[in-house]
Swiss-Prot record:
Belongs to the phosphatidylserine decarboxylase family. PSD-B subfamily. Prokaryotic type I sub-subfamily. The keyword Nucleus does not apply. Its EC number is 4.1.1.65. The keyword Cell membrane applies. Pathway: Phospholipid metabolism; phosphatidylethanolamine biosynthesis; phosphatidylethanolamine from CDP-diacylglycerol: step 2/2. The gene is psd. It is found in: Cell membrane. The record marks G249, S250 as: Cleavage (non-hydrolytic). GO terms for molecular function: phosphatidylserine decarboxylase activity. InterPro entries: PS_Dcarbxylase, PSD-B, PSD_type1_pro. This is Phosphatidylserine decarboxylase proenzyme. The lineage of its organism: Bacteria, Pseudomonadati, Pseudomonadota, Gammaproteobacteria, Moraxellales. GO terms for biological process: phosphatidylethanolamine biosynthetic process.
Amino acid sequence: MSFTSRLKKELFIKAQNLVPQHQLSRVVGKVAASENPILKAAVIHAFKTKYGIDLSIAEQGNALKYKSFNDFFTRALKDGVRLVDENPDSIVSPADGAISQIGKITAGKVFQAKGQSFSVEKLIGDPQLAQPFQEGEFATVYLSPRDYHRVHMPFSGILTETLYVPGELFSVNQVTAENVPGLFARNERMVCLFDTELGRMAVVLVGAMIVAGIETVATGKVKPSGRIELQHHELKLEKGAELGRFYLGSTAIILFEKDKIEWEKRFKAESVVVMGERMGHTL
């Protein structure tokens, strides 16, 4: 890596430490939620042009019909665009995106990037709730700005707890993952925990810089409180059902217990996945 490239990365990381992350995200959130026709049309057009958004696969193909940028960003897809693998033993991708990392949880640590990892206990935010996932399996899926931003169930289960964990709002791209220790266990997140026929399963929705919010079907849109909030539920969700959505991009991490599943060998870091695609299978 050249000196210039290293310097750019260092400045990018330092800038994130200096920027008032939550205040910036709140400002962006207000713009994203605005229903002012001129403002929302301008923002949607700029975003659509920059990221090459394909609205032909969206349920609503007319960008002017969305009531706000948030409405556009969390757009639904047409029926049949994403097919959920129906094999009973399939573990499917919870989202459209790219795999950041995938594999085993070793010594209670989840691999983040070269030279970086974090504890599953810190990720979950509660030692007792994290215990079943020690030495288990994980997959981290990064949703880029151009992706479909709803998160779905990787396997059928009963939602038993949601745990809001306050935190920072670093960017979650590859540069940050390689340079910010414990990134996903430091950022604000919503932990969703399930009982399944395989035992415990977790889906963690991780926030990021300028992410205007996280929403789940059980809690609605999360209102940051600055403190850990545990809620109990008993909500059955089938594989492929919508679990939540991001208002601007971020990351979903799925966790399973030890010796319950195996990932398909073709998947590795940077592999592209789509929601409903088979990523693994039960043992």
